[in-house]
């Protein structure tokens, strides 16, 4: 125990002595003849280019030893040419202090040990001896601390120099350690690590030597990218080990190599004598290379591949494919879909069993606990392959019993099932309880036999099955049934191997159902079929005034700049880069192109690794008439930073083009860049057929988009590689995993992702770039032309202005475009227009994008052309925006969500609608096309005095969107809504994804006569939630095809939908997952909606629907509210129905709300409600209440739960009866059952009650030119205000209200906005006189007050008309005020109570 205590004290003493790394000091290098003599110390030397300094310097840090001050171990010569490490006996004051501290610590520690020993040891004599020995040791240490032993010292030396700094001479004399020297430039260099016979590893890169290079080491010597002056340079390398030397651009001179193993690249003529190799390289010169290597010598890149003659050009790349396509194969091989532990889950009625690895490859094991159920399921977590009816498929597995066959191990049979996903427990959910509905499976088959009996060998069992109908979206399950009721008292197991479904091989023949057009109704615009004309004589790289990058004379320094330096092109020169000009592996730190300079790339395959390129002048890598055919890779390097390393405000890791600069990067044109299937592609297919001519190539990557609704949670987009291509037929290297629809209704898009010119971030899915989501970026503040580029892993997540391709604050440009490019796997957006106008984005594609893709940033961007582009698989950043009903969800700007609208990331994000969008397609995303509301510009344009949301669409024609809108209940594939604001106080953006309305005007200027409609022309929507979701005041949708969407559109304000096909169910077998489809839902208040010339088709009854609104109906009522009540706001005309049963035409849900009671619309030509006697005449449809049964033409439809009547001379009328303290104006949100009376029809021969309830929420809607009897259960109010909201010109309401006898009245009409329409009612002689009058008289028959409600302020032009149908305006603030008084009857709290509910005469 005592020894353990001593040990603890020794450990304590050790840790008090050990020191950490310590900076000793810095030394400025002012002499270009510089040497370091470190022959007596261990050194770790790093040569670093540092452009933050102007004068070279040494930074010396102690790693080990006693030194704490640079002067203790270093002397510097007076001329500062030599730094020498030495062993000095006189210490600096600081080291003396350290010595004193050490002594003090040692005394304290030894005294503690002595004290400890004397108090814990019974042998006092031995304790005293211990203490004496300690003091002797202390005395020796005190004597020794007067000097430092440099053999125990290790230092780190950083030699920091500015880029392109050149030494006259540079010498290192080294002891043990290591040196990493990159970017050293000198006339002569000498590195000696041999003299001290110590091991010092040496790595050298990017070395430039003009006169002499000498390197000697006892370890390996490795030098990469060595540049020697072409004449009079001597290089001597010596080691007892190995030498690996690589020249940057060859070597010209004599060589002498002494080594038992020599490897030389081509370029030299040599002779060998013993182990000595001598000769000349590249014609020889006065330069000499001498190598002595004890083991081996390797010399690379000896040949001079880059001549410096200005007329020399590398051979340009060919425009032809790198590989000629083989023929499309005639027989497609069979395809297996394998199942195993990773994609199956055990499910049963009880017990939770995990699948474990099996005994052999491709096998898994199931161990049943005691008394498990006799039946269980193996359910696939992946969608099943789609299966064609009538095709023979094979299911097979190999099974091994874990125990001998017995009572509890016997398997009676196995069944395969295909279930509708909604009918069973979700295999990807948390529950393992297998439950399915009473609906039959899509398909099942049982098989049994003797192959389930072996516990010694796997025995294969297979069955052939042939579905009787096509199976689309399905879950595959395998049911295993045992003979015994339970598994018994002991655990048992089985193993399954090679479980799979096999799709048989088939012959490849041209299908008979190839499409000749992509739409039935619409003509979607397509780009020109012509390729851009090319003229090879115009190629910039052929021009004669170019100078070569690799020619030392190009550079003022006389040498080719090193990759690790900040490279600035010489002013006024046009510099040509060829593949041999640059290192293909080293990372170039920064290249700057001054305003008068140009950097031109050759049209030849090359790779340039770079951190930053700053273009103040011009960068040319192809032009519009000379598009490059070479495979050129530009790889951007760098870890995440917010420091501006390119230039101020321009970020890091990319290309920035300054104002006044110009960039042109234009690769081979592939056309079309995207197309569509011309027939459906099935699971297992290798071959697809497309609609358009294409010039794609073998080896390129192709995307086929999803044909399902939710592409984010069920990603069925597939990236394939072309194996063969002939015309419009493409064969892939592997079979398709999913089904991709290509019917007449719509077709999956097929997009080319590959390009010959590639910009990419340096990550590969595993490196730091990917984990930091920090790729490269291209920013253009001047003019820029880009075509034929693929950008991979570009963009920098949540860093503003760091996007793959980005026009940044360039104003109105004259000649800028991005054409036929591809952005894939982007960390932040795809194509951005920011503070820039007149840009063209044409024929581009994008796939797998984080945040908004095509992105117009601040709300000031106008007059841009966005034509024929494609975007797919776009991901919201963070939590996707959801929220209840119309309110949406609010997101605040944060470090993890710099642009809060990225919570609703769309394929196209348009902050100012005054741009041209033609022929684009959007697959996936929160929405396909997003038009957020901005009351002010944001970002750099907050002071611009416009209202972006007031600008109408400049052009929106022929665009397509699908597989989107599902994150939010009210989300749409085209979403005009949401609100983005900037808070001046917090300096943060806020985004609300919900309902925000916009009103649009000419030039964005609000004034009378400037009103403009948001117009969507020839639009196709499919697999969508709301299709077009428009929250605004004015919208026209003309030309629409909607297929397999929950609802084709939700349109607010004055809205017209015309010339459309609305298809509830297409032929896509993976789209029908039991979702409710609605043709159109009429809104419940204050809008004007007209539907005209629409074909509704394939709305099929759902026997399991909960109510009519969820039963695949064509027209749906909105019935959720008593606060919001419809006026006469909806109309239809020229409606046709195809494959729609009569029961499915209208879906009206009967609930006790005003919106349910007052549901109505006008069918202006009886086309939607056929079977009327007055064929072609207008028909009025009203809700379930007989309040709408106004004449003998009315009939009740039991399927629709609505009254249908000939309209005749009637119109929809609406008033608000306002009573102080009972029914107030506005949205008072009273309860739905807050009944205060009834409104009943009277007159016109009506004698029975045809009524509707009045609640405390204002508003009654019914039929005009009828008698409306208003009765209040609380008693008749003494004061009533009737707002005549919608009684159109030449129409009226004959209103009756009961009062006690002898009541007197003061009745007046007032129009808030023009008092010339104000008047007082006068007493008439009869009720009929009132009804037949002009609306200025009243009559009281001692039971009922009669007035005629008309609106004399109307001109007759108060309506919205489109497509031959009208919807009349709501007219604001035209009111009739009734004041009643009675000398005989006193009101109670303003009400005359106890008044009988007596219906006026039916003869009135």
From Swiss-Prot:
Subcellular location: Membrane
Family according to the record: Belongs to the comF family.
Signal peptide: 1-20
Keywords: Glycoprotein, Membrane, Signal, Transmembrane, Transmembrane helix
Coiled coil ranges: none
Protein source organism: Dictyostelium discoideum (Social amoeba)
A single cellular component GO annotation: membrane
UniProt protein name: G8 domain-containing protein DDB_G0286897
Main location: membrane
Lipid bilayer topology: Multi-pass membrane protein
TM region positions: 97-117, 128-148
Xref: SMART domains: G8
Pfam annotation, one family: G8
Domain G8: from-to ranges: 553-679
Glycosylation positions in this chain: 352, 365, 413, 481, 639, 838, 979, 1003, 1017, 1253, 1334
């Amino acid at each position: 125990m005592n020894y353990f205590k001593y040990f603890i004290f020794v450990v304590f003493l050790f840790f008090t002595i050990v020191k950490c790394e310590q900076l000793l000091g810095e030394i400025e290098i002012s002499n270009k003849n510089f040497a370091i003599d470190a022959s007596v110390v261990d050194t770790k030397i790093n040569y670093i280019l540092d452009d933050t300094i102007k004068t070279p310097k040494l930074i010396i840090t102690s790693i080990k030893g006693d030194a704490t001050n640079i002067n203790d171990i270093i002397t510097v010569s007076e001329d500062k040419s030599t730094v020498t490490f030495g062993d000095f006996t006189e210490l600096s004051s600081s080291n003396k202090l350290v010595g004193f501290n050490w002594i003090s610590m040692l005394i304290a520690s030894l005294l503690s040990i002595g004290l400890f020993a004397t108090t814990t040891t019974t042998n006092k004599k031995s304790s005293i001896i211990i203490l004496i020995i300690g003091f002797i040791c202390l005395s020796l240490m005190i004597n020794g601390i007067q000097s430092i032993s440099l053999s125990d010292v290790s230092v780190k030396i950083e030699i920091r120099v500015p880029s392109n700094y050149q030494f006259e001479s540079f010498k290192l004399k080294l002891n043990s350690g290591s040196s990493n020297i990159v970017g050293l430039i000198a006339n002569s260099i000498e590195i000696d690590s041999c003299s001290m016979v110590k091991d010092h590893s040496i790595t050298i890169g990017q070395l430039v030597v003009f006169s002499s290079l000498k390197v000697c080491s006892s370890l390996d010597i490795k030098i990469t990218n060595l540049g020697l002056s072409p004449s009079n340079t001597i290089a001597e390398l010596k080691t007892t080990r190995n030498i690996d030397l690589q020249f940057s651009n060859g070597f010209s001179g004599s060589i002498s190599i002494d080594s038992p193993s020599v490897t030389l690249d081509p370029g030299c003529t040599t002779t060998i004598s013993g182990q000595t190799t001598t000769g000349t390289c590249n014609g020889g010169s006065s330069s000499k290379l001498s190598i002595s290597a004890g083991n081996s010598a390797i010399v690379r890149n000896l040949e001079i591949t880059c001549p410096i003659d200005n007329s020399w050009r590398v051979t340009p790349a060919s425009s032809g494919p790198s590989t000629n396509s083989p023929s499309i194969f005639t027989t497609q091989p069979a395809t297996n879909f394998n199942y195993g532990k990773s994609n199956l889950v055990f499910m049963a009625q009880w017990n939770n069993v995990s699948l474990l690895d099996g005994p052999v490859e491709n096998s898994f094991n199931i161990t049943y606990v005691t008394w498990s159920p006799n039946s269980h399921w193996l359910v696939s977590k992946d969608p099943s392959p789609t299966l064609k009816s009538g095709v023979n498929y094979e299911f097979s597995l190999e099974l091994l019993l874990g125990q001998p066959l017995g009572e509890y191990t016997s398997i009676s049979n196995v069944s395969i099932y295909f279930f509708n996903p909604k009918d069973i427990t979700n295999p990807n959910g948390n529950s393992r309880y297998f439950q399915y509905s009473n609906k039959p499976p899509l398909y099942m088959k049982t098989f049994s036999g003797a192959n389930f009996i072996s516990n010694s060998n796997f025995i294969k069992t297979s069955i052939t099955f042939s579905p009787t109908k096509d199976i689309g979206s399905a879950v595959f399950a395998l049911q295993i049934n045992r003979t015994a009721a339970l598994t018994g008292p002991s655990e048992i197991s089985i193993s399954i191997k090679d479980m799979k479904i096999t799709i048989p091989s088939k012959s490849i023949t041209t299908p008979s159902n190839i499409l000749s057009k992509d739409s039935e109704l619409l003509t979607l615009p397509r780009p020109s079929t012509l390729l851009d004309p090319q003229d090879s004589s115009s190629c910039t790289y052929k021009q004669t005034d170019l100078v070569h990058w690799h020619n030392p004379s190009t550079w003022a320094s006389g040498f080719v700049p090193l990759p690790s330096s900040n490279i600035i092109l010489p002013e006024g020169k046009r510099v040509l880069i060829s593949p041999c000009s640059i290192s293909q592996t080293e990372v170039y730190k920064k290249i700057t192109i001054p305003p008068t300079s140009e950097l031109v790339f050759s049209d030849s395959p090359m790779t340039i690794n770079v951190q930053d390129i700053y273009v103040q002048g011009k960068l040319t890598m192809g032009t519009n008439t000379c598009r490059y055919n070479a495979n050129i890779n530009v790889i951007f390097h760098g870890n995440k930073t917010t420091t501006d390393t390119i230039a101020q405000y321009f970020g890091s890791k990319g290309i920035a083009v300054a104002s006044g600069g110009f960039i042109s990067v234009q690769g081979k044109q592939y056309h079309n860049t995207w197309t569509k299937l011309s027939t459906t592609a099935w699971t297992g297919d290798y071959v697809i057929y497309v609609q358009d001519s294409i010039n794609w190539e073998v080896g390129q990557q192709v995307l086929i988009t999803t044909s399902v609704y939710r592409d984010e949670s069920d990603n069925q987009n597939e990236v394939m590689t072309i194996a063969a291509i002939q015309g419009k037929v493409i064969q892939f290297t592997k079979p398709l995993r999913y089904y991709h629809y290509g019917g007449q209704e719509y077709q999956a898009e097929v997009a080319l992702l590959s390009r010959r010119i590639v910009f990419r971030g340096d990550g590969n899915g595993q490196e730091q770039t990917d984990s930091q989501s920090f790729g490269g970026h291209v920013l253009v503040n001047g003019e820029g032309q880009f075509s034929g580029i693929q950008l991979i892993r570009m963009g920098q997540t949540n860093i503003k202005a760091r996007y793959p391709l980005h026009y940044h604050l360039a104003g109105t440009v004259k000649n800028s475009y991005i054409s036929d490019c591809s952005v894939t796997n982007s960390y932040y957006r795809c194509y951005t227009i920011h503070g820039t106008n007149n840009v063209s984005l044409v024929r581009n594609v994008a796939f797998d994008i984080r945040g908004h893709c095509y992105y117009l940033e601040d709300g000031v961007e106008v007059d841009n052309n966005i034509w024929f582009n494609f975007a797919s698989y776009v991901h919201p950043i963070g939590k996707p925006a959801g929220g209840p009903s119309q309110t949406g969800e609010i997101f605040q700007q944060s470090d993890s969500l710099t642009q809060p609208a990225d919570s609703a990331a769309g394929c196209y994000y348009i902050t100012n609608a005054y741009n041209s969008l033609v022929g684009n397609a959007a697959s996936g995303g929160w929405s396909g096309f997003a038009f957020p509301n901005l009351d002010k510009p944001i970002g750099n344009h907050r002071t611009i005095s416009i209202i972006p949301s007031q600008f109408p669409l400049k052009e929106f024609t022929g665009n397509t969107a699908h597989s989107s809108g599902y994150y939010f209940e009210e989300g749409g594939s085209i979403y005009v809504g949401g609100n983005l604001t900037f808070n001046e106080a917090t300096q943060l953006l806020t985004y609300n994804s919900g309902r925000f309305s916009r009103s649009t005007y000419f030039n964005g200027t609000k004034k009378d006569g400037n009103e403009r409609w948001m117009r969507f022309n020839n639009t196709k929507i499919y697999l969508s939630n709301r299709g077009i979701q428009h929250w605004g005041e004015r919208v026209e949708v003309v030309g629409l095809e909607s297929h397999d969407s929950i609802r084709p559109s939700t349109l607010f304000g004055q809205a017209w939908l015309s010339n459309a096909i609305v298809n509830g169910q297409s032929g896509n077998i993976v789209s029908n997952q039991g979702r409710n489809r609605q043709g159109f839902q009429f809104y419940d208040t204050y809008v004007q909606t007209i539907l005209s010339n629409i074909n509704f088709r394939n709305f099929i009854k759902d026997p399991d629907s909960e109510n009519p609104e969820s039963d695949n109906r064509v027209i749906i009522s909105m019935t959720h509210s008593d606060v919001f009540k419809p006026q006469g706001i909806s109309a239809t005309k020229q409606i046709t129905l195809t494959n729609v049963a009569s029961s499915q035409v209208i879906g009206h849900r009967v609930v006790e709300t005003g919106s349910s009671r007052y549901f109505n619309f006008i069918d202006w030509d009886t086309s939607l409600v056929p079977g009327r006697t007055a064929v072609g005449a207008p028909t009025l449809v009203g809700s379930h209440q007989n309040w709408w049964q106004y004449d003998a033409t009315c009939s009740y439809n039991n399927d629709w739960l609505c009254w249908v009547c000939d309209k005749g001379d009637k119109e929809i009328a609406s008033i608000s009866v306002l009573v102080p303290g009972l029914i107030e104006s506005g949205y008072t949100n009273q309860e739905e059952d807050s009944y205060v009376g009834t409104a009943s029809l009277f007159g016109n021969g009506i004698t029975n009650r045809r009524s509707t309830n009045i609640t405390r929420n204002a508003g009654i809607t019914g039929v005009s030119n009828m008698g409306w009897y208003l009765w209040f259960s609380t008693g008749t109010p003494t004061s009533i205000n009737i707002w005549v909201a919608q009684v159109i010109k030449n129409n009226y309401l004959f209103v009756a209200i009961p009062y006690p006898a002898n009541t007197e009245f003061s009745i007046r009409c007032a129009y808030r906005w023009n008092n010339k329409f104000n008047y007082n009612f006068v007493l008439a002689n009869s009720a009929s006189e009132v009804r037949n009058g002009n609306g200025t008289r009243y009559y009281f028959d001692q039971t009922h007050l009669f007035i005629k409600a008309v609106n004399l302020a109307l001109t007759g032009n108060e309506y919205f008309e489109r497509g031959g149908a009208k919807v009349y305006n709501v007219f604001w603030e035209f009111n009739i005020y009734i004041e009643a008084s009675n000398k005989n009857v006193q009101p109670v709290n303003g009400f005359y109570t106890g008044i009988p509910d007596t219906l006026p005469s039916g003869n009135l």
